[in-house]
Regions:
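Short regulatory helix/loop adjacent to the ATP-binding pocket of P-loop NTPases
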Residues: 125-140
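Conserved AAA+ ATPase "SRH/arginine-finger" region at the nucleotide-binding site
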Residues: 142-154
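Short conserved motifs of the RecA-like P-loop NTPase core
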Residues: 169-182
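The conserved phosphate-sensing helix
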Residues: 182-196
Length: 219
């Protein structure tokens, strides 16, 4: 068969509360999000590796409140008015390139107007070493929750959920095989799923063990 991609049904990424698999590695973050609006602190940072479920948790929060959700790279002065009309602001994938003055101003709005602020990032924001002292003070007074590396049960659930989202049927014994051999990294798990999906479509092959072994070697 040629290397041309064949027709596939559109995949659907489920970001509902009932689709989130809870394990000891993410229990604290999950419980905190679901405690809204009775948060012990109104500003929180949830951090963890790529694919750890931060965006899923953000979407769960978004379903509970009047919310503005935005990627860090899209932050601008225009967000001030928009935030004023919302109850909660979610800033995703915060990094050191963010404007410290802009972030500090948004933080102040959250505190002064009794709003909620959720920031997601790969690393805890108290490790960013901001130059603006007032911003550092805000960070220090906020709640910071980490999501740990996945357990075997969580890896299995992530694989099963993503295969289901993509309308793919994979035998449980093959999922067990993957769990025992894949790198214990959310990023690698995500990369494996995307690569397996891509190459099965290119080759027109079912999700046989042979293909799974090939993809595990590739990543």
């Amino acid at each position: 068969m040629s290397d041309q991609l064949i027709l596939k049904f559109p995949s659907h990424q489920a970001y509902k509360k009932e689709d989130f698999y809870v394990s000891p590695s993410n229990q604290e973050a999950y419980d905190f999000i679901n405690s809204w609006p009775k948060w012990i602190k109104r500003t929180v940072n949830i951090f963890g590796p790529s694919g750890s479920g931060k965006s899923h948790l953000a979407s769960i929060l978004k379903s509970k409140t009047s919310c503005l959700q935005i990627e860090t790279k899209k932050l601008s002065d225009e967000i001030f008015f928009k935030f004023k009309t919302k109850e909660t602001l979610i800033i995703e994938n915060l990094d050191k390139k963010v404007s410290e003055k802009l972030l500090f101003s948004l933080w102040n709005i959250a505190l002064q107007d009794n709003k909620y602020l959720l920031i997601t990032s790969k690393k805890p924001i108290n490790s960013f070493k901001f130059k603006l002292r007032d911003l550092t003070s805000r960070v220090t007074s906020s709640l910071i929750i980490g999501i740990n590396l996945p357990s075997d049960d969580l890896i299995s659930a992530i694989l099963a959920k993503n295969f289901s989202d993509k309308q793919i049927t994979v035998e449980k014994k093959h999922i067990d095989y993957i769990v025992k051999r894949i790198d214990r990294s959310y990023e690698k798990i995500s990369q494996f799923i995307l690569t397996l999906d891509k190459y099965s479509l290119k080759k027109g092959s079912p999700f046989a063990l042979k293909l799974i072994k090939e993809v595990l070697k590739m990543i």
